Each structure stands twice: as C-alpha cells, then as structure tokens.
C-alpha cells in the first residue's frame, strides 16, 4: 500500500481457448481498467499484484502515466514492419498518437500527423512530425495526403483516433 506502480491494465482469464492459443486480446473474460473495472482515475483501485510493476525512483510522477500508452505505441510500430524512409500517416494526435508518431520517427520514418485540432497538430510538429494535415474536411485531407506522398499514399497508416470514420480513412489513404 502506498507504492508507486505501473499497471498492466488488462486482465485475462488465461484458461479459455483464446488465451491458451496466445490470442489473449480476444479473451471473452477480459477486464480492462477503466472500462470493465475501476481505472486509474478512481480514488481507489483494486488490481492483482502480479499486474503491477514497482516504479524506480528515477521515473517521475509526470513520466509514469506515459508508460502504458508508450507500450501501446511501440508495440504497434514494431508490428507495422516500418522501415527507414517509409511514409507514415498517424491519424489522431492524442497521447497514443503522439507517442506513436515519436516511435515511428525513431524508426526512421517520415511522419504525417493527421488530426481535426490545429493545436494538436502544432504539438505533433513540435514532437517531430514532418508534415501535418487537418482532416476536418476529409476530401481536402485526402488530397493533401496524396500530394505529400507523390500520389501513392502512406506506406503505413496508424489509426489512433478511435473516431467512427478514421478506420475507413486509414484504409482508403494507405498505398496499395
């Protein structure tokens, strides 16, 4: 009690067909902190000790909350197969999107940040985006993406916004 910890926010059963096959992301018994159980913004949170990691003193209270979203971003970038020089669009410049942008930059990609908020796009530029596109007008945004990629489209598009229309945009914009 009182220790500073990072939390693995997903609980799985470990015994169902999917868990036994290594496909824990589709476990029907899954609980996710903040959705199916109390999350980190609750005054108190009960969570299994084996899903927590003690934070060392050299990780500040400001940095600690970025551990979980950073793992999401880095995992996605690793799975993407990105290569140095690839054109990458990151749709959504919230916490996960900005961390994803930085991970793609670290991998040597040219990154186009896409969002509906100009303030978020300014922050994306400060954090390393090579180009920014406001997608309030989807047709204009699609044309800008094509222009920025030589009429081919991004090699990879990461959808981090979670909006209804953004998965379709990601599929349509990405090169064939």
Model-derived features: positions:
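Glycine-rich phosphate/pyrophosphate-binding beta-alpha loops
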Residues: 6-10
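Adenosine-nucleotide cofactor-binding segment
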Residues: 90-93, 105-169
